[in-house]
């Protein structure tokens, strides 16, 4: 039997950074907790980033994950918004890296593909599938649901990174960038094999 792995998903945002904790053991996923870290929009950028840094640090210390997954930056036409998101994402990457945790990154379309079966899935579809895969999940904002989706994605693709783990001198694990490609889905369904296995397992339990 495979050992359980605690995975912290982080959905970066300057105003709200979502986080979600799950435990993965084989194809079984268990909900842990979720929430958001916020920054005061009235403060200067440097102080807002400090709020995110300290807030994410408290979460990492409290939930003690084994691995961390972060959503990659989505570049849009609003350069200023993209830049602000980049600042927030830097905090999401830096905090767990300083804690010696392995950090992986996933593209938004891969997260949607893994969780909902389509790289163009809407937020409501993502939230519905998160609730389906994690029946005990409780979230009030989309940021927390997105963070859980990121954690689920890493649970589905983490084996692809197993041989790429490296260590820094002194025994600290190095933060890695996971540019995982989507696995082959079921014919005509678009789900990855791991995601399909979880859905089938959930259906079997309900049946």
From Swiss-Prot:
Task: Cite the cofactor comment.
Answer: Binds 2 Mg(2+) ion per subunit.
**Source domain of life:** Bacteria
- Give this protein's Gene Ontology molecular function annotations: crossover junction DNA endonuclease activity; DNA binding; magnesium ion binding
How this chain assembles, per its entry, is:
Homodimer which binds Holliday junction (HJ) DNA. The HJ becomes 2-fold symmetrical on binding to RuvC with unstacked arms; it has a different conformation from HJ DNA in complex with RuvA. In the full resolvosome a probable DNA-RuvA(4)-RuvB(12)-RuvC(2) complex forms which resolves the HJ.
**Which parts of the sequence bind Mg(2+) 1?**
11, 143
Query: Per the record's keyword annotation, is Nuclease included, yes or no?
Result: yes
Required co-factors? Mg(2+)
Q: Which CDD domains match?
A: RuvC
Q: NCBIfam families, from UniProt?
A: ruvC
Gene Ontology cellular component list: cytoplasm; Holliday junction resolvase complex
**Where in the cell is the protein located?**
Cytoplasm
The protein's UniProt keywords, in alphabetical order, are:
Cytoplasm, DNA damage, DNA recombination, DNA repair, DNA-binding, Endonuclease, Hydrolase, Magnesium, Metal-binding, Nuclease
Q: Which GO terms describe its biological process?
A: DNA recombination; DNA repair
Report the catalytic activity. Endonucleolytic cleavage at a junction such as a reciprocal single-stranded crossover between two homologous DNA duplexes (Holliday junction)
Source lineage:
Bacteria, Pseudomonadati, Pseudomonadota, Alphaproteobacteria, Hyphomicrobiales
Q: What organism is this sequence from?
A: Methylobacterium radiotolerans (strain ATCC 27329 / DSM 1819 / JCM 2831 / NBRC 15690 / NCIMB 10815 / 0-1)
Q: Where does Mg(2+) 2 bind?
A: 71
Function of this protein? The RuvA-RuvB-RuvC complex processes Holliday junction (HJ) DNA during genetic recombination and DNA repair. Endonuclease that resolves HJ intermediates. Cleaves cruciform DNA by making single-stranded nicks across the HJ at symmetrical positions within the homologous arms, yielding a 5'-phosphate and a 3'-hydroxyl group; requires a central core of homology in the junction. The consensus cleavage sequence is 5'-(A/T)TT(C/G)-3'. Cleavage occurs on the 3'-side of the TT dinucleotide at the point of strand exchange.
**Catalytic residue positions:** 11, 71, 143
State the protein's name: Crossover junction endodeoxyribonuclease RuvC
Question: Which InterPro entries does the record match to this protein?
Answer: RNaseH-like_sf, RNaseH_sf, X-over_junc_endoDNase_Mg_BS, X-over_junc_endoDNase_RuvC
Principal localisation? cytoplasm
- What top-tier enzyme class does this entry carry? hydrolase
EC numbers listed for it are 3.1.21.10
């Amino acid at each position: 039997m495979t050992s359980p792995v605690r995975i912290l998903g982080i959905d970066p945002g300057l105003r709200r950074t979502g986080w979600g904790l799950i435990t993965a053991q084989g194809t079984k996923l268990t909900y842990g907790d979720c929430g958001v870290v916020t920054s005061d929009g009235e403060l200067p950028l440097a102080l807002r980033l400090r709020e995110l840094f300290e807030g994410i640090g408290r979460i990492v210390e409290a939930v003690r994950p084994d691995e961390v997954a972060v959503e990659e930056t989505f570049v849009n036409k609003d350069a200023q918004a993209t830049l602000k998101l980049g600042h927030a994402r830097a905090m999401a990457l830096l905090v767990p890296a300083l804690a010696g945790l392995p950090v992986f990154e996933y593209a938004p379309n891969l997260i949607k593909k893994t969780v909902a079966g389509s790289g163009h899935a809407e937020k409501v579809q993502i939230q519905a599938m998160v609730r389906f895969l994690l029946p005990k999940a409780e979230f009030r904002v989309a940021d927390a649901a997105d963070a859980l989706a990121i954690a689920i994605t890493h649970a589905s693709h983490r084996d692809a990174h197993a041989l790429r783990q490296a260590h820094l001198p002194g025994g600290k694990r190095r933060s890695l960038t996971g540019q995982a490609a989507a696995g082959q889905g079921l014919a005509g369904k678009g789900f990855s094999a791991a995601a399909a296995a979880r859905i089938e397992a959930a259906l079997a339990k309900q049946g």
